[in-house]
């Protein structure tokens, strides 16, 4: 079994926050792949289903962000999972809005949800870093992540979530490159090819110059007029 965790804060008040993009990601996977209903378990809510050959449990911790590791640790102990079975979807200030990066292991970079997970299960798990951009000053970070996405963000956000759902099966089987390609196709769809075999219209030929019938003396005189 694989455990996909989306980080966020519970309740309608936080539903549209930038900090909740992890919740949004696993919700998109559940919806696109016909997962079962969400039910309360492991200090959060879970939904079960299959992605290709893999049985996958989706988890949204409801401990609030800073205690996410309690929920994740409980689920992993129940199913006897290792960090290699865990992938966490979370917001990333250090990536531009709409950018996505995969990471295996490493530090938490100050993210309180990851910090809590580190404390409960170690750091050797996978992450899907979902770019939300940075407000420009560290003092503005808290209010920035706890505010909703702007209307101008909705286009790329919807494309990103669709791409995550498209590539979820590849991610579950460990094919990170194919997962990222699925997201890229949603974010930057290929340009339509020009029809082959159509010849470009020929440029119109310049009209031939009329023959110069002036005498040499006339041409010389015209130069000084």
UniProtKB/Swiss-Prot annotation:
Q: What InterPro entries does the database record attribute to this sequence?
A: Pept_tRNA_hydro, Pept_tRNA_hydro_CS, Pept_tRNA_hydro_sf
Q: What is its main location?
A: cytoplasm
Give the reaction(s) catalysed.
Answer: an N-acyl-L-alpha-aminoacyl-tRNA + H2O = an N-acyl-L-amino acid + a tRNA + H(+)
Q: What class of enzyme is it?
A: hydrolase
Recorded GO terms, molecular function?
peptidyl-tRNA hydrolase activity; tRNA binding
Q: Where in the cell is it found?
A: Cytoplasm
Q: Does the keyword tRNA-binding apply?
A: yes
The reply to whether GTP-binding figures as a keyword in the UniProt entry is no
Site feature Stabilizes the basic form of H active site to accept a proton, where: 91
User: Region annotation Disordered: residue ranges?
Assistant: 187-225
Q: Name one GO cellular component term.
A: cytoplasm
Q: Which residues bind tRNA?
A: 14, 64, 66, 112
Database matches in PANTHER family: PEPTIDYL-TRNA HYDROLASE
Q: What does this protein do?
A: Hydrolyzes ribosome-free peptidyl-tRNAs (with 1 or more amino acids incorporated), which drop off the ribosome during protein synthesis, or as a result of ribosome stalling.
Q: Which family does it belong to?
A: Belongs to the PTH family.
Question: NCBIfam families under this entry?
Answer: pth
Q: How does it assemble?
A: Monomer.
Q: What is the name listed in the Swiss-Prot or TrEMBL entry for this protein? A: Peptidyl-tRNA hydrolase
- UniProt source species: Cereibacter sphaeroides (strain ATCC 17025 / ATH 2.4.3)
Please spell out the taxonomic lineage of the organism that makes this protein: Bacteria, Pseudomonadati, Pseudomonadota, Alphaproteobacteria, Rhodobacterales
Q: Which gene encodes it?
A: pth
